[in-house]
Amino acid sequence: NWQASGLRLDDPVKISATHIHIGNRFAFSYRDAEPWQPDPITNFNNTTIAAGLAALTEQAHDMAPAEGLATFIFPNSSLTTALPSATTEIAKIKSFVEAGHSNAEDILEPVTALIGLGPGLTPSGDDFLGGIMIALNLLEEVEKCRVLASAVENAASATNDISRAHLNAAARGVGAEPLHATIGDVISNRNHVLKASLERLDAIGHCSGWDALTGVVITLRAWLAE
């Protein structure tokens, strides 16, 4: 219980080269933290990606949470989404990824509808959009990512500071390590290790890992359809 320990809203925060100090009582060290960047993926083969997506659909079906947006990973399933209001907006975002001839104003409506949508400290809609930007970076779809990131920035006042920080990182192609591991397994069709990556992904937030993965899957499918 952080409140019982003396932590209060609006306590002053000071960040040094090795610690984060909060008020006069707490100091969190990151002295031993090491910089990390996801490994680039350079071999994009349509057949391999399609096989990886098929393996994901099979292995993730019984693992994916009912909450959030993970049911969109399984387009032909009888699973019911917990956020049906997202269906139309996700279709619009998918069309943008497939076409790519849009500007930020054209996709601002679906982005605005998704920002702040769903459960979690980083809401499901935010994580979904972050997953799309990460995937676009990996696929070197620079202009599409720039347009989407611009729309996200315009709508980001509807979410919280922590989620905005994650979205900013996603616009640069950076997410949680288990997400990148799962993406690598899918793109390279490493189905023998995919389940282990999914189990680590499952531990991210309320359902944030799955929501971000949904954005990745939507993007990969749209990319294959181009």
Predicted stretch roles:
Residues 178-226:
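Acidic, carboxylate-rich catalytic segments that either coordinate divalent cations
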Residues 119-137, 208-220:
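Conserved phosphate/anionic-ligand binding catalytic regions in large, soluble enzymes, centered on
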Residues 147-157:
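Long, charge-rich alpha-helical interaction segments
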Residues 115-123, 169, 199-208:
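A short glycine/serine-rich beta->alpha loop
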Residues 136-147, 221-226:
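Short helix-capping/linker segments at secondary-structure and domain boundaries
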Residues 1-100, 104-105, 109, 120-125, ...:
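Phosphate/adenylate-binding glycine loop and adjacent helical scaffold
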